[in-house]
A protein has these predicted regions:
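Flexible, acidic/histidine-containing loops and adjacent segments that form or flank the divalent-metal
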Residues: 1-105, 170-226
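Long, structured stretches of catalytic cores involved in phosphate-ester chemistry, encompassing
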Residues: 105-111, 115-206
Length: 226
């Protein structure tokens, strides 16, 4: 499949710029760094420690998913990046699951690999995969209707304590849209304690959401420069 799109071109250009700087003066300055992580053949993924307070566990893709994504009829989202971040702040441990656009096939595989080690899938904050699309947690049956995958729901449902789910999408309305999906939202709400709607955050309706950053920043989060 063709991975480069009009939207991705600036990202690839920036990656190339940073790669070209490697080994040269200035490569470690803010805005010039880059880390290269190779897809592993191990079903246990890859753990990368960036500092004593930040760790990334790459759950997907593994090599077979990366190779499959090169097939002519492949779904490129089968090679989407899934990372569970662990961030330690003031002695506390915060776990953040970023599922990219990973499909239900990927989440099925992740559950099969980690069902006996579910701590590796636990989170305080979950970014709903594929902008809260239904195809991250369900697949079509022979009649063309979506059936939910218990494996995928189990993989995504390892919430710690109360937890938050964030949907990076337009407002999720009660209709038959597949991306974002109202039905998928209900599944994520079911993962949260008491199905608390206030803990499901959507940027398109953020006027009703709790502030997750300082109001002293002119109501804008600070950019992260790496």
């Amino acid at each position: 499949p063709k991975f480069e799109t009009d939207e991705s071109k600036p990202v690839f250009q920036e990656i190339k710029r940073r790669l070209d700087l490697q080994g040269k003066q200035g490569s470690e300055l803010n805005g010039n760094r880059i880390s290269i992580l190779e897809a592993t053949s191990s079903s246990n993924g890859l753990v990368k420690t960036f500092s004593r307070n930040i760790e990334a566990h790459v759950l997907s893709p593994v090599k077979k998913e990366g190779e499959a994504s090169n097939a002519a009829q492949a779904d490129v989202n089968d090679a989407s990046l899934v990372i569970r971040w662990t961030v330690k702040v003031f002695g506390g441990m915060n776990r953040i699951m970023l599922g990219g656009d990973a499909t239900v096939e990927v989440w099925d595989r992740i559950w099969q690999n980690y069902q006996n080690n579910t701590d590796k899938l636990s989170w305080h904050i979950l970014l709903a995969p594929h902008h809260c699309a239904i195809d991250a947690i369900a697949r079509k049956n022979k009649d063309g209707k979506y059936e939910y995958s218990e494996n995928a729901l189990n993989a995504l449902g390892q919430v710690i304590s109360d937890g938050f789910v964030v949907s990076s999408s337009k407002e999720i309305k009660h209709n038959d849209d597949l991306l974002p999906s109202w039905e998928a939202k209900q599944k994520y709400l079911g993962m949260l304690k008491d199905a608390d709607e206030a803990r499901f955050l959507n940027p398109d309706t953020r006027a009703n959401a709790p502030l997750l950053y300082s109001p002293l920043q002119d109501d804008k989060p600070e950019p992260v420069v790496f």
